[in-house]
Amino acid sequence: MGKLKEMLAEDVTMMIASDHGFTELIYEFHANEWLQRLGWVKYRENRKNSLEDVSLGSKAYSLIPGRFYINLKGREPNGEIKLEDYENVREELKGMLLEIEGPEGGKVIKSVEKCEDVFTGDHVGIAPDLVALPNDGFDLKAGFGEMEDVFGKGPRNGMHTFENALLIIDRPGMEIEGSNLYNIAPTILGLMGIEHDPAVFDGESLI
């Protein structure tokens, strides 16, 4: 970074940002295999290769990364759960997720968030009902193929995290504590002196 900084003119601000952190990967957790063994996911006869194979009788299914959908009647193609039972089923699934332990002990899931607490905007209607965030060392997978076990080992020994992202702005007086990805685009426009309508951004410029 020092060499890059030396290449810049004195009136140029260097900004370096990442959208994720990094951690070790010990086990993959196959969410749909877990749900199937608990009787929460059922498939069409002799088929379990895709989301289309999820059949009546299913309570929920998972898509990566850590997204869980209640099989709600009227919303899902083969919906099973009635609207009046939705919240109870969602709370039950949340509790089950938080109790999962890895092969060597320790909790797999760090937290489980409800959709209305993390998503906003025009497309919130297609957001997952629950979002599970793993503890370090676990990668939440959601394939629909045949799995030997709920936990497995993959080819990688590292993975992204949702935390510990990097942000460096080489400009005196910049306050980046508590900032997030929403701040990046308006900050870049501000640094470049480009006029824009702040109302179209979810975040504010850090300048």
Write out the residue ranges for each language-model feature.
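Glycine-centered flexibility motif
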Residues: 9, 39, 114, 157-158, ...
